[in-house]
């Protein structure tokens, strides 16, 4: 980036219609994994005015009361009254769940390496659940090694929900979005340019007299005070609150929502590339999810080891095969050692076969519902296995 370039990322709150769907899908997944860790799950959710539709494919020995899971999660998010446009206690819930395709199952249960090539390694038994490409990224912008724009957007979204739920701003409603524009000098963030914050609110709240000053003081300035970034000037940012002038009608009444429609919010805010696969509602046999988590784990450890200031890693799979068909490492000229050595070290330190990823990150657990909002990467409020920097010494030794 040349001097003076502006980069923008956005986040949304847990009450955004698409995020309601992600939360429901991952809550169903967790309920099944808790009883049967080997559950195969692909659950999609749609919400609209007064209705929730849950569909997909599941193979499991577990039982989940899906309508109850749906209602409990919606109520927890904060949609508990028709005055808010949606009520988890009274909305309609329709469930249409079938079994996983046996054609897919045979490739996952018995990989090409075992079925055709005759390999005996247990980690060659499980094939990838689909073809596809997944990216991981890390950068030294923040202590959690995430790009600053998305990290700040998530903090603002979490704070917006916090002041609603703890009663500090009790007139707020669950639906909301945040957007952060930061000025860069090269790759260094130097100035916070613009914050856009749209939040659903009770009727009759004055935008200029109440909402905007409350959001500036209780949300934005509180988050910025805790940010403590060394190079970022936050003294003269522009704040735009509800630029349409009013946001009373929100949630599923304002917009229909679908699982998997916030994949850039879920990852790196557009700063890094994305393979296209969504996460929520998918068990770890789906490499869309598990391999994207593994790539973040790889990238974070590379940066934490001091091998590069920023790195993007791509992996690719063929459905039904265990071994990746490709690995690509990009350090953007920020490396401290030969990138070819970094790529070789990654191959030696990390086993990227699906069964190995599941084993090393302990993914057959009900840990997914908390990831459904505020990002899957760089989380500081919950512990996630792919955020560990436990391979730093191994990478240094391999180099």
Curated annotation (Swiss-Prot):
<feature type="binding site" description="in other chain">
    <location>
        <position position="57"/>
    </location>
    <ligand>
        <name>L-methionine</name>
    </ligand>
</feature>
<feature type="binding site">
    <location>
        <position position="255"/>
    </location>
    <ligand>
        <name>L-methionine</name>
    </ligand>
</feature>
<feature type="binding site">
    <location>
        <position position="18"/>
    </location>
    <ligand>
        <name>Mg(2+)</name>
    </ligand>
</feature>
<keyword id="KW-0963">Cytoplasm</keyword>
<dbReference type="InterPro" id="IPR022630">
    <property type="entry name" value="S-AdoMet_synt_C"/>
</dbReference>
<feature type="binding site">
    <location>
        <position position="44"/>
    </location>
    <ligand>
        <name>K(+)</name>
    </ligand>
</feature>
<protein>
    <recommendedName>
        <fullName>S-adenosylmethionine synthase</fullName>
        <ecNumber>2.5.1.6</ecNumber>
    </recommendedName>
</protein>
<comment type="similarity">
    <text>Belongs to the AdoMet synthase family.</text>
</comment>
<dbReference type="Pfam" id="PF02773">
    <property type="entry name" value="S-AdoMet_synt_C"/>
</dbReference>
<keyword id="KW-0547">Nucleotide-binding</keyword>
<feature type="region of interest" description="Flexible loop">
    <location>
        <begin position="100"/>
        <end position="110"/>
    </location>
</feature>
<dbReference type="GO" id="GO:0004478">
    <property type="term" value="F:methionine adenosyltransferase activity"/>
</dbReference>
<comment type="pathway">
    <text>Amino-acid biosynthesis; S-adenosyl-L-methionine biosynthesis; S-adenosyl-L-methionine from L-methionine: step 1/1.</text>
</comment>
<dbReference type="Pfam" id="PF02772">
    <property type="entry name" value="S-AdoMet_synt_M"/>
</dbReference>
<dbReference type="GO" id="GO:0005524">
    <property type="term" value="F:ATP binding"/>
</dbReference>
<feature type="cross-link" description="Isoglutamyl lysine isopeptide (Lys-Gln) (interchain with Q-Cter in protein Pup)">
    <location>
        <position position="341"/>
    </location>
</feature>
<dbReference type="GO" id="GO:0000287">
    <property type="term" value="F:magnesium ion binding"/>
</dbReference>
<dbReference type="GO" id="GO:0006556">
    <property type="term" value="P:S-adenosylmethionine biosynthetic process"/>
</dbReference>
<keyword id="KW-1017">Isopeptide bond</keyword>
<dbReference type="Pfam" id="PF00438">
    <property type="entry name" value="S-AdoMet_synt_N"/>
</dbReference>
<dbReference type="InterPro" id="IPR002133">
    <property type="entry name" value="S-AdoMet_synthetase"/>
</dbReference>
<keyword id="KW-0460">Magnesium</keyword>
<comment type="subunit">
    <text>Homotetramer; dimer of dimers.</text>
</comment>
<feature type="binding site" description="in other chain">
    <location>
        <position position="100"/>
    </location>
    <ligand>
        <name>L-methionine</name>
    </ligand>
</feature>
<feature type="binding site" description="in other chain">
    <location>
        <begin position="246"/>
        <end position="247"/>
    </location>
    <ligand>
        <name>ATP</name>
    </ligand>
</feature>
<feature type="binding site" description="in other chain">
    <location>
        <begin position="175"/>
        <end position="177"/>
    </location>
    <ligand>
        <name>ATP</name>
    </ligand>
</feature>
<feature type="binding site">
    <location>
        <position position="255"/>
    </location>
    <ligand>
        <name>ATP</name>
    </ligand>
</feature>
<keyword id="KW-0554">One-carbon metabolism</keyword>
<keyword id="KW-0479">Metal-binding</keyword>
<dbReference type="GO" id="GO:0005737">
    <property type="term" value="C:cytoplasm"/>
</dbReference>
<keyword id="KW-0832">Ubl conjugation</keyword>
<keyword id="KW-0808">Transferase</keyword>
<dbReference type="InterPro" id="IPR022628">
    <property type="entry name" value="S-AdoMet_synt_N"/>
</dbReference>
<feature type="binding site" description="in other chain">
    <location>
        <position position="16"/>
    </location>
    <ligand>
        <name>ATP</name>
    </ligand>
</feature>
<feature type="binding site" description="in other chain">
    <location>
        <position position="286"/>
    </location>
    <ligand>
        <name>L-methionine</name>
    </ligand>
</feature>
<dbReference type="GO" id="GO:0006730">
    <property type="term" value="P:one-carbon metabolic process"/>
</dbReference>
<dbReference type="InterPro" id="IPR022631">
    <property type="entry name" value="ADOMET_SYNTHASE_CS"/>
</dbReference>
<dbReference type="InterPro" id="IPR022636">
    <property type="entry name" value="S-AdoMet_synthetase_sfam"/>
</dbReference>
<keyword id="KW-0067">ATP-binding</keyword>
<feature type="binding site">
    <location>
        <position position="278"/>
    </location>
    <ligand>
        <name>ATP</name>
    </ligand>
</feature>
<keyword id="KW-0630">Potassium</keyword>
<comment type="function">
    <text>Catalyzes the formation of S-adenosylmethionine (AdoMet) from methionine and ATP. The overall synthetic reaction is composed of two sequential steps, AdoMet formation and the subsequent tripolyphosphate hydrolysis which occurs prior to release of AdoMet from the enzyme.</text>
</comment>
């Amino acid at each position: 980036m040349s001097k003076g370039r502006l980069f923008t990322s956005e986040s949304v709150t847990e009450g955004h219609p698409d995020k309601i769907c992600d939360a429901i899908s991952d809550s169903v997944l967790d309920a099944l994994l808790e009883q049967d860790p080997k559950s195969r799950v692909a659950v999609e959710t749609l919400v609209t005015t007064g209705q929730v539709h849950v569909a997909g494919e599941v193979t499991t020995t577990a039982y989940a009361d899906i309508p109850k899971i749906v209602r409990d999660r919606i109520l927890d998010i904060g949609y508990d009254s028709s005055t808010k446009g949606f009520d988890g206690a009274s909305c309609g819930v329709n469930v249409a769940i079938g079994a996983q395709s046996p054609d897919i199952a045979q490739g996952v249960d018995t990989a090409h390496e075992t079925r055709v090539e005759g390999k005996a390694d247990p980690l060659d038994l499980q094939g990838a659940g689909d073809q596809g490409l997944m990216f991981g990224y890390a950068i030294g912008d923040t202590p959690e090694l995430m790009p600053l724009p998305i990290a700040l957007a998530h903090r603002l979204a979490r704070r917006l929900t916090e002041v609603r739920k703890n009663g500090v701003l009790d007139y707020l409603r669950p639906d909301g979005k945040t957007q952060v524009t930061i000025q860069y000098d090269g790759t260094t963030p130097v100035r916070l340019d613009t914050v856009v914050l749209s939040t659903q609110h009770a009727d009759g709240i004055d935008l200029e007299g109440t909402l905007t000053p409350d959001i500036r003081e209780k949300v934005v300035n509180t988050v910025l005070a805790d940010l403590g970034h060394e190079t970022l000037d936050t003294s003269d940012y522009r704040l735009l609150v509800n630029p349409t002038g009013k946001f009373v009608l929100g949630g599923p009444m304002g917009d229909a929502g679908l699982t998997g429609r916030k994949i850039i919010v879920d990852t790196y805010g557009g700063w890094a590339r994305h393979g296209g696969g969504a996460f929520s509602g998918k068990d770890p046999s789906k490499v869309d999810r598990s391999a994207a988590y593994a790539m973040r784990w790889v990238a974070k450890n590379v940066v934490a080891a001091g091998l590069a200031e920023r790195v993007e890693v791509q992996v690719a799979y063929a459905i039904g095969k265990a071994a990746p068909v490709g690995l690509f490492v990009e350090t953007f000229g920020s490396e401290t050692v030969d990138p070819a050595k970094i790529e070789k070290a990654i191959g030696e330190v990390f086993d990227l076969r699906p069964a190995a990823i599941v084993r090393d990150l302990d993914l057959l657990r009900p840990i997914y519902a908390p990831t459904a909002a505020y990002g899957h990467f760089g989380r500081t409020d919950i512990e996630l296995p792919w955020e560990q920097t436990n391979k730093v010494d191994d990478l240094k030794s391999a180099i």
